Amino acid sequence: LLFEKSYEYGEHQGLGFVQGEVCPLEPDLKDPALKVPQIGWNALHILRDDPLFQYIQEGEYVYYVHSYYGRHCTASTLAVSDYSIPVTGVVRAGKVYGTQFHPEKSGDTGLRILKAFAEL
């Protein structure tokens, strides 16, 4: 919804807050451990410092449940996780933030991210 375009259930225009598109997750399926949808915990790798991360450390784990991910959004990407490909974890465009993972299901790490968001 936040991106310019999505290919989830057809091709659709988004709101365009974030440059890029939402595409099907296509990890290296030669690895039998990698499934789609991805359901589980992955380390969050912070690419750019941001107040959203003030209460977490590099590499803390967050919980994903998804079959799609944002791509071609390098300018807006704040953090990624690895699923044989870099999966966009957090984007920001001005005052608009989005997460691919579920902060509300990410335990203490997610609560600290939500705390930082509430303080923005």
Q: What is the meaning of each model-derived region?
A:
Residues 4-6, 67, 106:
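Short linear Ser/Thr-Pro motifs
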